[in-house]
C-alpha cells in the first residue's frame, strides 16, 4: 500500500485541487497496486491502464484550468454488471463471452462526467447471484482480511465481492456495486468497508445487466462514510431511459456528515433477534445502540412482524424475475454460442454451457414458480408478503422512527469452499437474512464497520431509512464510524 493509495476520496480530492499530487500519479499508484495484488485477490477481471491514464491526463488538464468535476482524477473500479463502452462487460458469466457494449451505463457515465477515472472491471458473482463471490466464471475473489494467525482464504461476500475487496485492499479509491438482496451491504460488512444501497429509483438501472428488475439498485462501496456520500451524489440522477428512475434530484449527501443525531428515534426490531445468532453479533448491536444513545438519539423497540417471511418471498420474486430477464441470452446475437443440430439445440447447448450452476438453479426455480400450476401458490403469495413487509416499515416510520439499526450479517467472513454451504444452497441463502427486507420494501440501507470479532475479522451494522432519506443514514453512520474507528486489513498479498 503506497501513501497515495491510502488516501480517501475526500483527501485525494483536496490534494488534487491543491496540486500536491496529479491525477496521473494517483492513477499510476493504483495501477501498480493492482498489478502487485490482483493475482492473489482476483478482484479485477479486466484492467484498463490505457483508458485510465488517458482519463487521468484529461483530469489533470481540467484541474489546471480550475474546471474540475466533483470526482476529478479519482480512480474507481466498476462492477462487471455495469455496461462500459467498448470494454469487457460480462456480468462474470461465460454466456456473455467477449461482449463489449457500444453504450455506457447511466451510472458510470455520471461518474465519468464528474471526472472519475476508470481502472477496470471488478469480479462478482455471476449475474449478481450469490453471497460469497464464488459463483464467478473468473474464479472466487479472496477477502483481503484473514483471521488472526490463519492463512485460510476467506470470501469477501457477494455479489459485489470484487468491489468490496478492491476497496479494502486499496486497489481503487471507491467502486460501483449493485444490491438486489444485500449485494452491497454484506460484502462491505465482510471487508470492513462502507456500502449503501440507496432507495429504489435513486440511481438509474439503465445499462446495468438485470437480475431482478424490481429489486436491483446501484450504489457505492467506499472506505468511509464520507467517501460513500461523495460517490452516491455523483452516481444518482434522474434518467428518462429508466422508467423506475425517480424524479428527485439527489441532495449534497456530504453535507450530512457531522450533523447531530440528537433527538432522533432509532428503532430496534425484535424480529431481527434470530435463533442461533452469535453472541458477538448481539454484543455489537448493543454497542451500536449505546453509541447512538450517547450521541443523543432515543432507542425504541419496534416490531416488523413479517420479517420472518422475507427470505423465502425474496428468493421467489428474485428468481422469477431472473428467469424472465435471463431468457434473452440465447447465443444468437452476442456472447457464447455452442453449435447444435438445429436452433433449439443451439439454444439449449449455449445456455447449458454459458450459465453456471447457481444461475441455472435460480432460473429453474423462477420458471417453476411462474408456471401455470404454481403461480398463485408461490409468486402471487410472495408479492402479497412483499406488500405486508413494506407496510410494516411504513407503520414504524409513521410512528416517528427516523432510522432502524440492525445487524447486517449473521457472521463474519467464512472460508472459500466451505463444504457445509456448498452442500446446502439454502444455508448460503441465509446470509441474506438481515438484508433482503429493505430490498423488498425499496428502502435505503447502509452497512458501516462497527468492530472486529474474536478472530480479528470485521463486522458491520446496518441502518435502514425512510424512502429517499439517505442523508439520515449518512449522518447516523458517521456517529457509529467515529465511535468504532476504521479498520484496515494487514497486508499479506
Curated annotation (Swiss-Prot):
**Mind listing the UniProt keywords for this protein, alphabetically?**
ATP-binding, Ligase, Nucleotide-binding, Protein biosynthesis
Q: What Gene3D superfamilies does the database record attribute to this sequence? A: Amidase signature (AS) domain
Give the EC number: 6.3.5.7
Q: Name one GO biological process term.
A: translation
Q: Which SUPFAM superfamilies match?
A: Amidase signature (AS) enzymes
- List, alphabetically, the NCBIfam families matched: gatA (TIGR00132)
Under the heading HAMAP family, the entry gives:
GatA (MF_00120)
* Protein name per the record: Glutamyl-tRNA(Gln) amidotransferase subunit A
Q: Which organism is it from?
A: Allorhizobium ampelinum (strain ATCC BAA-846 / DSM 112012 / S4)
Gene symbol here is: gatA
Amino acid at each position: 500500500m503506497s501513501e497515495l493509495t491510502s488516501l480517501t476520496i475526500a483527501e485525494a480530492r483536496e490534494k488534487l485541487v491543491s496540486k500536491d499530487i496529479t491525477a496521473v500519479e494517483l492513477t499510476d499508484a493504483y495501477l501498480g497496486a493492482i498489478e502487485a495484488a490482483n493475482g492473489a485477490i482476483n478482484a479485477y477481471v479486466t484492467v484498463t491502464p490505457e483508458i485510465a491514464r488517458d482519463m487521468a491526463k484529461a483530469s489533470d488538464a481540467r484541474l489546471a484550468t480550475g474546471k474540475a468535476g466533483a470526482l476529478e482524477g479519482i480512480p474507481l473500479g466498476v462492477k462487471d454488471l455495469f455496461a462500459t463502452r467498448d470494454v469487457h462487460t460480462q456480468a462474470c458469466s461465460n454466456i456473455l463471452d467477449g461482449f463489449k457494449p457500444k453504450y455506457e451505463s447511466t451510472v458510470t457515465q455520471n461518474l465519468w462526467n464528474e471526472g472519475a477515472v476508470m481502472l477496470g472491471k471488478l469480479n462478482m458473482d455471476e449475474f449478481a447471484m450469490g453471497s460469497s463471490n464464488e459463483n464467478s466464471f473468473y474464479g472466487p475473489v479472496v477477502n483481503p482480511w484473514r483471521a488472526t494467525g490463519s492463512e485460510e482464504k476467506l470470501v469477501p461476500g457477494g455479489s459485489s465481492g470484487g468491489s468490496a475487496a478492491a476497496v479494502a485492499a486499496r486497489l481503487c479509491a471507491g467502486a460501483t456495486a449493485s444490491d438486489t438482496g444485500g449485494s452491497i451491504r454484506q460484502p462491505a460488512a465482510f471487508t470492513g468497508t462502507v456500502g449503501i444501497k440507496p432507495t429504489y429509483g435513486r440511481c438509474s438501472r439503465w445499462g446495468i445487466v438485470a437480475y431482478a428488475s424490481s429489486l436491483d439498485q446501484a450504489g457505492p462501496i467506499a472506505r468511509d462514510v464520507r467517501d460513500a456520500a461523495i460517490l452516491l451524489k455523483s452516481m444518482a440522477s434522474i434518467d428518462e431511459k429508466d422508467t423506475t428512475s425517480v424524479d428527485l434530484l439527489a441532495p449534497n449527501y456530504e453535507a450530512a456528515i457531522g450533523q447531530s443525531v440528537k433527538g432522533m428515534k432509532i428503532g430496534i426490531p425484535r424480529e431481527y433477534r434470530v435463533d442461533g445468532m452469535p453472541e458477538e453479533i448481539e454484543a455489537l448491536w448493543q454497542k451500536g445502540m449505546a453509541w447512538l444513545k450517547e450521541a443523543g438519539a432515543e432507542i425504541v423497540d419496534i416490531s416488523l412482524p413479517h420479517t420472518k417471511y422475507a427470505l423465502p418471498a425474496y428468493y421467489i420474486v428474485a428468481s422469477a424475475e431472473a428467469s424472465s430477464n435471463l431468457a434473452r441470452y440465447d447465443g444468437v446475437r452476442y456472447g457464447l454460442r455452442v453449435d447444435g443440430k438445429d436452433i433449439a439445440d443451439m439454444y439449449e447447448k449455449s445456455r447449458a454451457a454459458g450459465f453456471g450452476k447457481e444461475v441455472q438453479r435460480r432460473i429453474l426455480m423462477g420458471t417453476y414458480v411462474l408456471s401455470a400450476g404454481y403461480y398463485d401458490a408461490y409468486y402471487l403469495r410472495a408479492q402479497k408478503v412483499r406488500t405486508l413487509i413494506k407496510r410494516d416499515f411504513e407503520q414504524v416510520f409513521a410512528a416517528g422512527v427516523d432510522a432502524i439499526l440492525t445487524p447486517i450479517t449473521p457472521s463474519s467472513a467464512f472460508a472459500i469452499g466451505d463444504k457445509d454451504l456448498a452442500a446446502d444452497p439454502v444455508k448460503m441463502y441465509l446470509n441474506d437474512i438481515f438484508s433482503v427486507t429493505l430490498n423488498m420494501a425499496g428502502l435505503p440501507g447502509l452497512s458501516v464497520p462497527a468492530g472486529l470479532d474474536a478472530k480479528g475479522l470485521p463486522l458491520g451494522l446496518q441502518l435502514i431509512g425512510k424512502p429517499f432519506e439517505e442523508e439520515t443514514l449518512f449522518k447516523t453512520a458517521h456517529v457509529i464510524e467515529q465511535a468504532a474507528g476504521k479498520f484496515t486489513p494487514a497486508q499479506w498479498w
